[in-house]
Curated annotation (Swiss-Prot):
Keywords: Ribonucleoprotein, Ribosomal protein, RNA-binding, rRNA-binding. GO terms for cellular component: large ribosomal subunit. This is Large ribosomal subunit protein uL10. Forms part of the ribosomal stalk, playing a central role in the interaction of the ribosome with GTP-bound translation factors. Gene3D superfamilies: 3.30.70.1730, 6.10.250.2350. Belongs to the universal ribosomal protein uL10 family. Part of the ribosomal stalk of the 50S ribosomal subunit. The N-terminus interacts with L11 and the large rRNA to form the base of the stalk. The C-terminus forms an elongated spine to which L12 dimers bind in a sequential fashion forming a multimeric L10(L12)X complex. One of its GO terms (molecular function) is large ribosomal subunit rRNA binding. GO terms for biological process: translation. It comes from the Bacteria. Signal peptide: none annotated.
């Protein structure tokens, strides 16, 4: 007996596959208990940071991940699941989740960041990393400090009258 494939599910599969194409950072959230307004606000904040949020069916998501040869994420696909992808700085998107966790019922399940599976604990630590701009700024201040000290020392020496 041949099992007919529901065209709606095929469409969902293709849509989700396209949603994940070219994305190195995928996060899984449990949105149970969030109001529509809270979920809309979360989606808006994620989009502001060049990310995207989509509520998914777990079985279809499992098939898409299998199709993309991504393993180790099945444990995050239980219960209501929202998938978030990050186009640029994934840790900025993760920070948004943890801001929402403080004030709502949102739960972070885990993720897939640059080819590695991250559990909730790892994602929490990842969310605390500085952004690319903050890292560059910190690096520049480290480089600038010795030069500033040298300039002040030379200035002090030139101010001393012999």
């Amino acid at each position: 007996m041949d099992k007919k494939i529901n065209p709606k599910k095929v469409e969902m599969f293709n849509s989700l596959k396209e949603f994940l194409d070219g994305k190195d950072n995928i996060f899984f959230l449990d949105y149970r208990g969030l109001t529509v307004a809270e979920l809309t606000k979360l989606r808006s904040r994620v989009e502001d940071e060049k990310g995207a949020l989509k509520v998914v069916k777990n079985n279809i998501m499992k098939r898409v991940l299998k199709d993309k040869d991504i393993e180790g994420l099945d444990s995050y696909l239980l219960g209501p699941t929202a998938v978030v992808t990050a186009f640029d700085e994934a840790n900025v998107i993760a920070k948004i989740f943890y801001e929402f966790v403080k004030t709502t019922t949102l739960k972070v399940k885990g993720g897939f960041v640059l080819g590695e599976v991250y559990d909730e604990l790892k994602l929490s630590a990842y969310s605390k990393l500085p952004t690319k701009i903050e890292s560059i700024s910190l690096f520049m201040s480290v480089l600038k400090a010795p030069m500033s000290k040298l300039v002040r020392t030379l200035k002090a020496l030139s101010d001393i009258k012999v």
